[in-house]
């Protein structure tokens, strides 16, 4: 599918208990979240699979949970944790890897929007999880083929990044100042504050996360009021988002009055699945996006080479600040002119100045000028460290490669 008004995106919010799925097209006002029950506002799909013992048919979600109460079904839950632990699950005489079953569950969830008459294929799938690790990112990308897509169609983000995409895809009046979110997770309340640096182009966006708070069960309203007062110190806030079942229980009186004082307040549990859809759509039009997100998983500096291309001097960007270091990789082939040295340009997104770091290719066999081609590969190993590999490719059949490879770890 092309990246036009008909481009189609899927966003899944996933944890070890449930999934939520939304879909989005550029001609829609906002993403739409899908329920397994037509007309229902119950969007959480339990992360459960069940299989009938006598036959190989699989059920998922609420239906799997309901059917598992009969003795004819085998029920499997906590699939995300089991998949990350590479568990093997045995049912009757069959054995399955948990990752395989998680992919089966996700495939069924991904098919839900198509049952509403939407396309069966899509441009991009974004999966949102609580936190990113090298292990879960690697697992999801390894799962792409089972999901019927290629890895270029898949993106994995965490909840903070989903909040970033959700908030900044709203009407501009909602993010004139800071945007904040209170999120309930079991007994804890977490506070997130999104700030934009107006001095930079593009604007650098950061999200601060507070320590967790606990509501006093005897007086939730007063307890939340205290949390709000503590969290809102020294901030001008345009909009507040409330995510979690507890906020819909009807106990907010004084606290909601304070929240709404000069601010817009929204409540709902499907923010992260909608944010995942916005992430998918935004990444297909990144050139128009006036922000760069600097979270804990995002690269902290730009890494470039200065090259001559068709007679013009230009910068070739290997790694971009704000790109997720789990996913980023840069590679190019260049012909060396002059000495056997490569200059790397390092720049912070908030700075106009660049640092130049020169790597000398020691023990390179002598050749005429412009008769050596090298391949440069830049692979981040964290959000502020990049492994540089430079490989001598020789020069066609005239000068064979020496086979030499140079490694260096680069920091800002």
Residue ranges of model-derived segments:
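Early-domain small/polar-rich strand-loop-helix modules and first-structured segments
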Residues: 1-88, 155, 361, 366-412
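Glycine-rich phosphate-binding loop plus the immediately following alpha-helix
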Residues: 19, 44-54, 68-73, 196-228, ...
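Acidic low-complexity intrinsically disordered segments
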Residues: 288-412
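A short acidic Gly-Thr/Ser loop motif
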Residues: 5, 11-18, 173-190, 195-196, ...
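Small-residue (GG/TT-enriched) beta-loop-alpha framework at ligand/catalytic clefts
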Residues: 127, 135, 142-224
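Conserved phosphate-binding catalytic cores of ATP/NTP-utilizing and phosphoryl-transfer enzymes
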Residues: 1-10, 150-180, 271-292, 367-368
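Glycine-rich phosphate-binding loops at beta-strand->alpha-helix junctions
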Residues: 126-137, 230-256
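Conserved phosphate-binding loops in N-terminal lobes of ATP-dependent enzymes
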Residues: 35-128, 211-225
């Amino acid at each position: 599918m092309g990246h036009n008004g008909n481009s189609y995106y899927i966003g899944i919010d996933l944890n070890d208990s449930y999934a939520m799925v939304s879909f989005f097209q550029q001609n829609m006002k906002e993403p739409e979240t899908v329920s397994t029950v037509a007309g229902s506002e119950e969007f959480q799909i339990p992360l459960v699979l069940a299989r009938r013992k006598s036959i190989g048919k699989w059920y998922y979600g609420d239906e799997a949970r309901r059917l598992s109460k009969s003795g004819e079904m085998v029920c499997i839950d906590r699939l995300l944790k089991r998949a990350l632990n590479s568990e093997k699950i045995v049912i009757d005489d069959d054995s399955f890897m948990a990752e395989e079953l998680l992919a089966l569950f996700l495939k069924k969830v991904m098919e839900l929007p198509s049952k509403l008459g939407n396309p069966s294929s899509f441009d991009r799938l974004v999966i949102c999880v609580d936190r990113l690790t090298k292990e879960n990112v690697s697992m999801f990308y390894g799962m792409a083929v089972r999901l019927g897509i290629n890895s270029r169609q898949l993106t994995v983000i965490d909840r903070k990044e989903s909040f970033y995409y959700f908030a900044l895809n709203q009407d501009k009046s909602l993010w004139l100042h800071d945007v904040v979110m209170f999120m309930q997770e079991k007994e804890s309340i977490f506070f997130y504050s999104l700030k934009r640096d107006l001095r930079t182009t593009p604007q650098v966006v950061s999200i601060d996360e507070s320590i967790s708070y606990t509501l006093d069960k005897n007086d939730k309203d007063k307890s939340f009021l205290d949390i709000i007062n503590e969290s809102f110190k020294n901030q001008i806030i345009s909009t507040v988002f409330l995510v979690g079942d507890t906020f819909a229980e009807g106990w907010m009186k004084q606290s909601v009055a304070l929240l709404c004082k000069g601010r817009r307040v929204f409540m709902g549990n499907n923010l992260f699945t909608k944010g995942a859809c916005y992430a998918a759509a935004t990444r297909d039009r990144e050139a128009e996006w006036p922000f760069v997100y600097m979270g804990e998983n995002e690269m902290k500096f730009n890494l470039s080479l200065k090259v001559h291309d068709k007679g013009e001097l230009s910068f070739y960007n290997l790694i971009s600040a704000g790109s997720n270091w789990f996913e980023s990789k840069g590679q190019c082939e260049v012909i060396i002119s002059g000495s056997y040295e490569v200059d790397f340009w390092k720049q912070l997104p908030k700075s106009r100045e660049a640092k130049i770091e020169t790597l000398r290719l020691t023990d390179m066999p002598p050749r005429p000028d412009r008769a050596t081609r090298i391949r440069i590969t830049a692979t981040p190993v964290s959000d502020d460290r990049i492994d540089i590999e430079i490989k001598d490719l020789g020069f066609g059949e005239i000068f064979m490669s020496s086979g030499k490879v140079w490694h260096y770890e680069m920091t800002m």
